[in-house]
Regions:
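Substrate-binding pocket helix/loop in short-chain dehydrogenase/reductase
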Residues: 88-89, 93-101, 197
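Active-site helix of classical SDR
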Residues: 112, 149, 157
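Conserved NAD(P)H cofactor-binding loop of Rossmann-fold oxidoreductase domains
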Residues: 80-85, 237
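Residue(s) in the substrate-gating loop at a strand-loop-helix junction
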Residues: 133
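Alpha-helical segment proximal to the catalytic Tyr-Lys
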Residues: 117, 162-166, 225
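Short C-terminal tail/terminal secondary-structure segment
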Residues: 138, 217, 228-243
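Active-site loop immediately N-terminal to the catalytic Tyr-X3-Lys motif
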Residues: 90, 138-144, 166, 204, ...
Length: 243
């Protein structure tokens, strides 16, 4: 039921952090994994890496066309890649805003559209998993590009889940809390910020990237055959904790 053995899987942002953990986890579970990222993986594994500039929609299209023409038809797409560029909103540069939209939203839609199309045309009942953030459930200051794009992805997921359900395609979000990844290294390396974020959870600690693998395999596999359009929160109790 929880098997992804033999499934073709595309993962963006698979060079480090959560994306790398997903690439290693799915390949260890027997999936055929292709990772897309602008940089090669920090750790070599039993998966294929393809250079892809996720801020360039034309390049994404070229890469996907090559993957599909080689006969790799995905059953699972995981959009994990993202950029975070913090700055006060009243001083936020247009270049950072556009980069956030390009990588965090445009790339997600392009990948969903192209993979969704080939799933539909190939009659594949597949699974698309988009990573959002606890920042779409609460207000986080000084990062408008990240907040806006992740919020948009949340709603895109729900729209696609409704539209593509008739084709047997499930589309869901994973909502991670603070995770020990290179993206969060500034907060992780600051003892005060690390403790503040740890204390906000029920477990008193951050997540490790590997803790996102199980939820992703659940959503990718037949174990979630009747689950679509949901936000699967993996935050150590951040959102539910009160006083």
């Amino acid at each position: 039921m929880f098997s992804v053995d033999g499934d073709n899987v595309i993962i963006t942002g698979g060079s480090r952090g959560i994306g790398l953990a997903l690439a290693e986890g799915f390949s260890s579970a027997g999936a055929n994994v292709i990772t897309l990222d602008i940089n090669p993986p920090e750790v070599e594994g039993n998966y294929n890496y393809i250079n892809c500039d996720l801020g360039n929609q034309d390049h994404i299209q070229v890469v996907l066309d090559r993957i599909f023409s080689d006969g790799f038809i995905p059953k699972v797409l995981i959009n994990c890649a993202a950029v975070t560029i913090p700055a006060p909103s009243h001083q936020y540069p247009d270049t950072d805003w556009r980069k956030s939209i390009s990588v965090n939203l445009d790339a997600v839609f392009t990948l969903c559209r192209e993979v969704g199309r080939i799933m539909i045309n190939s009659s594949i009942s597949g699974s698309i998993i988009n990573f959002t953030s606890i920042g779409v459930e609460q207000g986080f200051a000084n990062n408008p590009g990240y907040a806006a794009t992740k919020g948009a992805v949340k709603q895109l997921t729900k729209a696609l889940a409704v539209e593509w359900g008739e084709h047997g395609i499930r589309v869901n979000n994973i909502v991670p809390g603070y995770t020990n990844t290179p993206m969060n290294s500034k907060s992780w390396n600051n003892p005060l910020l690390r403790k503040q974020r740890s204390d906000r959870t029920v477990f008193g600690r951050w997540a490790e990237p590997e803790e996102m693998v199980g939820p992703a395999i659940f959503l990718a596999s037949d174990a979630s055959s009747y689950v679509t359009g949901v936000d699967l929160v993996v935050d150590g109790g951040w959102l539910v904790k009160g006083m």
